[in-house]
């Protein structure tokens, strides 16, 4: 008789690793009234992950389903993000402060003029809302005028009473936020005309503009010049060209 074949059985073991659910928020922690900032989760999760956002105080800041936070009134609120994958979940929070204005950038355009990027209801800005101070001497330079761009309300121009041409570092503070810039040294590095193309039969003012090495306007002189420091002439002879 034939011997019966032996049956061999092998046991295979698979280990399935399940990544833990994670959530961490990135985004601005300061937002102006009426403006928005987007919070996003920086942790990688399953495509099945569902994230929800809530605000501790909707009267200060609201948050949409996609993490967009809108400033309502000045104050502080805590945004909570909860991510869920199946039965697993994770939660994190981010504190957000709502201000009347948020100062993002500041730069010098002329010796007595600064340009700033500001969010908020900028049409209500006043010269006294800004503090311009020399970091070394702590001397404050008052702002005489605030102008808001008619097409882009976030572009704000500050006119100062005094020229800043000492190459010093200055602080500009608005609603508790401070940005810095280095002032011009007041040395002329280039000279040119502000308008090099003029429409035919159209009266157009032409200015001689001198700038420092960083492009800050040191001086503007209108033609014809009455300034003893600069002398320039315009030759109107030729075939449509001037020199």
Language-model segments: residues:
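Beta-strand/beta-sandwich contexts
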Residues: 101-115, 204
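Short beta-strand segments enriched for Tyr within beta-sheet-rich domains
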Residues: 170-172
């Amino acid at each position: 008789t034939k011997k019966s074949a032996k049956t061999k059985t092998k046991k295979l073991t698979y280990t399935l690793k399940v990544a833990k659910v994670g959530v961490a928020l990135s985004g601005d922690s300061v937002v102006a009234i009426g403006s928005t900032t987007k919070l996003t989760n920086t942790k990688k999760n399953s495509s099945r992950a569902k994230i929800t956002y809530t605000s501790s105080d909707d009267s200060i800041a609201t948050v949409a389903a996609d993490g967009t936070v809108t400033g309502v009134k000045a104050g502080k609120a805590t945004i909570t993000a909860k991510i869920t994958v199946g039965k697993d979940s994770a939660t994190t929070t981010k504190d957000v402060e709502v201000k009347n204005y948020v100062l993002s950038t500041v730069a010098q355009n002329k010796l007595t003029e600064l340009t700033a990027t500001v969010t908020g209801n900028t049409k209500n800005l006043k010269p006294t809302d800004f503090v311009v101070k020399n970091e070394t001497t702590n001397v404050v330079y008052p702002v005489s005028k605030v102008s808001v761009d008619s097409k882009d309300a976030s572009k704000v121009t500050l006119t100062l009473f005094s020229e800043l041409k000492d190459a010093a570092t200055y602080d500009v503070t608005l609603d508790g936020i401070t940005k810095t810039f280095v002032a011009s040294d007041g040395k002329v590095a280039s000279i040119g005309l502000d308008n090099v193309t003029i429409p035919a039969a159209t009266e157009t003012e032409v200015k001689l503009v001198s700038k420092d090495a960083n492009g800050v306007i040191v001086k503007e002189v209108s033609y014809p010049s009455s300034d003893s420091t600069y002398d320039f002439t315009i030759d109107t002879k030729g075939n449509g060209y001037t020199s």
